[in-house]
């Protein structure tokens, strides 16, 4: 058995928000293509996630919001949920499997079955707030997983690391202010979601990078800020919102990370 589990589901490829949307099935297709080409597929156990439990959803999101998503799932076509976020007939079910992957991954690690887990899921989650969607996100997968670890296993110190080019505003909305969570969030400043990035919750460290920042700056932040804080915090579990859109070839952002920077992370 491998020491890494890899979660994905066929429904993740069926969730679509219209033509030319950057959050598209090709994101996951490319991951699996590259894993096969590099030969890394043989070193992971591929698993299908369960659907998230209602209790886990309600730990992170308001009941009215969950009901709203359920009742607004369309039978055909697209239903716009917020200015940039829409559902097709597969979205709601896919979102529940995506959050279920986060919880199953937590179970796998905390039970000792695996050392680490990668969840290749769609829709993403870190812009989903307690009571509303946004930024292509419906359920906050990492927040649901973190609260699952706390609620089910009694963890006292969970670290959430977010290196997506966009600030994880939804994650801070749900987990901000908790004594049992540490949030480390590095992102491009003056970019969506244009949040109040200079007013971090007491349990969060925000590291905004100006346009044109190269990967060496993020590496330095990891060495000089994040790693000392993690060592001081002594997390029982580390969860990562692993967005790779700070890459220099990303059209919708202006950071300049390259492959070796992500390998370092």
Regions found by a protein language model. Give the residues of each.
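HDAC/HDAC-like amidohydrolase catalytic core signature
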Residues: 1-161, 165-265
């Amino acid at each position: 058995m491998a020491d890494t589990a890899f979660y994905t589901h066929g429904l993740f490829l069926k969730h679509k928000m219209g033509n030319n949307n950057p959050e598209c099935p090709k994101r996951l297709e490319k991951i699996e293509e590259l894993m096969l080409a590099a030969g890394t597929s043989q070193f992971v156990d591929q698993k299908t996630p369960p659907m998230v439990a209602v209790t886990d959803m309600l730990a992170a999101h308001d009941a009215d919001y969950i009901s709203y998503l359920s009742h607004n799932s369309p039978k055909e076509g697209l239903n716009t949920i917020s200015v940039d976020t829409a559902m097709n007939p597969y979205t709601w079910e896919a979102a529940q499997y995506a959050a279920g992957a986060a919880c199953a991954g937590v179970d796998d690690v905390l039970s000792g079955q695996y050392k680490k887990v990668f969840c290749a899921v769609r829709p993403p989650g870190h812009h989903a707030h307690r009571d509303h969607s946004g930024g292509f996100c419906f359920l906050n997968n990492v927040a649901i997983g973190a609260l699952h670890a706390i609620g089910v296993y009694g963890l006292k110190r969970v670290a959430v690391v977010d290196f997506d080019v966009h600030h994880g505003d939804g994650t801070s909305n749900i987990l901000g202010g908790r004594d049992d969570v540490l949030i480390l969030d590095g992102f491009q400043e003056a970019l969506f979601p244009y949040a109040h990035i200079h007013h971090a919750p007491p349990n969060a460290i925000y590291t905004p990078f100006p346009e044109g920042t190269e990967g060496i700056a993020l590496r330095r932040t990891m060495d000089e800020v994040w790693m000392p804080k993690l060592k001081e915090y002594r997390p029982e579990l580390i969860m990562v919102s692993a967005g790779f859109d700070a890459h220099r070839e990303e059209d919708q952002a202006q950071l300049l990370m390259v492959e070796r920077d992500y390998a370092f992370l």
